[in-house]
């Protein structure tokens, strides 16, 4: 299972990458999540400008066999939705790069420290 060292993770299998500006983060689902979901056919998110609470739902991922909610790792505002998600299969093929889901402006960047480290996430999924 691919668990990049430069990201933080949630128990709900989302990942977050804090960008160099220190207030913007990229969010997506993990390789483990996409493999458990199976073939992803549709991703829907709340619109740009939506404020989301930490652990609040910001969208859904629809796969052939199920629909799963997406939860914000930390509180913030959605500032961009990945336009490449029109082809939702990109989340299966490249969940950490081209398959990112939203960019958020964080309310409190210090919240990132409360997320799981790569080692902790690896232990969570039994890797």
From Swiss-Prot:
Modified residues (N6-lipoyllysine): 65
Alphabetical keyword list: Lipoyl
InterPro entries for the chain: 2-oxoA_DH_lipoyl-BS (IPR003016), Biotin_lipoyl (IPR000089), GCV_H (IPR002930), GCV_H/Fam206 (IPR033753), GCV_H_sub (IPR017453), Single_hybrid_motif (IPR011053)
SUPFAM superfamilies: Single hybrid motif
Co-factor remark: Binds 1 lipoyl cofactor covalently.
Names of required cofactors: (R)-lipoate
One of the record's GO cellular component terms: cytoplasm
UniProt KW Transferase keyword: no
Keyword Disulfide bond: no
The Lipoyl-binding domain, residue ranges: 24-105
GO terms, biological process: glycine decarboxylation via glycine cleavage system
Transmembrane segments: none
Job description of the protein: The glycine cleavage system catalyzes the degradation of glycine. The H protein shuttles the methylamine group of glycine from the P protein to the T protein.
Family per similarity comment: Belongs to the GcvH family.
Assembly with partners or alone: The glycine cleavage system is composed of four proteins: P, T, L and H.
HAMAP family per UniProt: GcvH (MF_00272)
Protein name: Glycine cleavage system H protein
